[in-house]
Amino acid sequence: MSKQQIGVVGMAVMGRNLALNIESRGYTVSIFNRSREKTEEVIAENPGKKLAPYYTVKEFVESLETPRRILLMVKAGAGTDAAIDSLKPYLDKGDIIIDGGNTFFQDTIRRNRELSAEGFNFIGTGVSGGEEGALKGPSIMPGGQKEAYELVAPILTKIAAVAEDGEPCVTYIGADGAGHYVKMVHNGIEYGDMQLIAEAYSLLKGGLNLSNEELAQTFTEWNNGELSSYLIDITKDIFTKKDEDGNYLVDVILDEAANKGTGKWTSQSALDLGEPLSLITESVFARYISSLKDQRVAASKVLSGPQAQSAGDKAEFIEKVRSALYLGKIVSYAQGFSQLRAASEEYNWDLNYGEIAKIFRAGCIIRAQFLQKITDAYAENPQIANLLLAPYFKQIADDYQQALRDVVAYAVQNGIPVPTFAAAVAYYDSYRAAVLPANLIQAQRDYFGAHTYKRIDKEGVFHTEWLD
């Protein structure tokens, strides 16, 4: 009996849809799930597909041609380790395990090291695009042994999303945990994008009292210009969706934003690397404070503050918010790609930032027209320290920073919280400052802890007895 070309473990929605995607590209696929019912359900719902169900790990592994290619789509963490442990007794040296889950990159580094020592290949692969992307074409970020990637590249290339220029949204990212790291930063950028959009929405509601229909029209217009992106596109649809009672759905959704922890991972890594990922970190904190609903309701009855006044001319303020949103987005990506650079140096990954931006252009949640500008910036100068220094982004900062400053000033004066817009201004001004007040902090540290300091007029390291 002929062997199957690839196996998929895990038949929850992402695993199921990726298996169907692979099958639709002409590959034969073995499927396995820990619970028999899920596998039977997939087969029953997809008659005529070249999906071969197996109900024991041994039979599943033995059904695959060698070197075996096995895609894991199981719950990250202990579930991934358990799945790997169940496979290992039946694998041969040179077989390839692909982890497509939302896995913490340090776990991927560990698994890659452990499996390599046993003669197996391990490819930690970020997959973005949600359920629809998994089925129709996601953005794929594989990392691991380059030679093993070459053996799975034809399949990954066929199932990936395709950008407008015909390029598949997949590329080899780098060694061990590089793929999952890039996916993690992608998710952090996603947090930043979503919070910036939410703050723009809050400003337009608070400053202009725009109706849902007006908001939808505004976002439709924005989506036809520089802000063209998946998130802007879906947001315009959200504003006009009504429930069964005729209420605008967005207006009756509880204002507590959940999270799965990947934004937190991005911020934690930034702290480990000493990277000022302020905007994305504020977007994580914004979700946390949103979850304090009961406290916020109680505080709203006790803590005073200004009531929002009209922002003035409607068209003028909408344009200011649009410009502020675009520049805020640029700052967020500048921070994210700066962190990728720091991680690449720390973990010896040799990341290609332009290629990373290219694979974000379709299939994934942060897909946006302006990603081509990032690719262009790195093509012009692969070693650029920060995207804000690239000519296009510098020009946008020159043109739009006053709008961002005006919007933040209006928000502060009118009691509208805009943590990520404010973070964008603070980062921009800090990054362009030749001199910061950190000299005083160094003096304080030396005063209470003898931590020493450097001087601008002399070489060396100094300590002062401040009480003399």
Swiss-Prot record:
Name the active site residues. K183 (proton acceptor), E190 (proton donor)
| Residues that bind NADP(+) | G10, M11, A12, V13, M14, G15, N33, R34, S35, V74, K75, A76, N102
Q: Which residues bind substrate?
A: N102, S128, G129, G130, H186, N187, Y191, K260, R287, R445, H451
Does the record bear Oxidoreductase in its keywords? yes
Write out the catalysed reaction.
6-phospho-D-gluconate + NADP(+) = D-ribulose 5-phosphate + CO2 + NADPH
* Domain of life of the native organism: Bacteria
Keyword annotations: Gluconate utilization, NADP, Oxidoreductase, Pentose shunt
Pathway assignment: Carbohydrate degradation; pentose phosphate pathway; D-ribulose 5-phosphate from D-glucose 6-phosphate (oxidative stage): step 3/3
Q: According to the UniProt record, what class of enzyme is this?
A: oxidoreductase
GO process annotations (BP): D-gluconate metabolic process; organic acid catabolic process; pentose-phosphate shunt
- EC number(s) on file: 1.1.1.44
What quaternary structure, including any partners, is listed in this protein's UniProt entry?
Homodimer.
- Please state what the protein is called: 6-phosphogluconate dehydrogenase, decarboxylating
Give the species this sequence originates from: Shigella flexneri
> What gene is behind this protein?
gnd
